[in-house]
Amino acid sequence: MFRGNHPTRVDEKGRLKLPADFKRRIDEQYGSQFFITSKDGKVAEIYPLQEWEKVEQKLAQIPNMNPAKKKFLDRVNYYGQMVEMDAQGRVLLPQILRESAQVTGDVVVFGMQSYLEVANHEAFKQNMELNPMTAEDEQALAEFGL
């Protein structure tokens, strides 16, 4: 399980060096293949291939004519790309996603349980300020026992 956050950088070639804590977990559990994508173009989502295959298994249960499935697949395939981690623990973020999510230079990598999320540090801070946790959010989470 991935948790916490680690500030890092995306180099001029678009490579993200995976933070040591996350890389250790990846080495122990997953291997070097990933599917990198986004549902909104605002953040990059890095799925170990085994975790992405779980998403695909769930998608396979949804009829192909379902409009939500089509929208989801359109987006994740538009931004998505299979990548392999190199010997230095780096993954190449797809150019279209780097540009859309502005994930160049200083970024932050969040553990999102089964995948990693990469965000532009400044844009993420602004989004948190514009969208604070509300009483409604807390109530919705309380319904799940959180």
Swiss-Prot record:
Domain of life of the source: Bacteria
Keyword Chloroplast belongs to the record: no
Locations listed in the record: Cytoplasm, Nucleoid
SUPFAM superfamilies for the chain: AbrB/MazE/MraZ-like (SSF89447)
Gene3D superfamilies listed in its UniProt record: Transcriptional regulator MraZ domain
GO molecular function: DNA-binding transcription factor activity; transcription cis-regulatory region binding
InterPro entries: MraZ, MraZ_C, MraZ_dom, MraZ_N, MraZ_sf, SpoVT-AbrB_dom, SpoVT-AbrB_sf
GO biological process entries: negative regulation of DNA-templated transcription initiation
Pfam families membership: MraZ (PF02381)
GO cellular component, as recorded: cytoplasm; nucleoid
Stored PROSITE patterns: SPOVT_ABRB
Ranges for domain SpoVT-AbrB: 5-51, 80-123
Entries under HAMAP family matching the protein: MraZ
Stated family: Belongs to the MraZ family.
PANTHER family the record matches: TRANSCRIPTIONAL REGULATOR MRAZ
Record protein name field: Transcriptional regulator MraZ
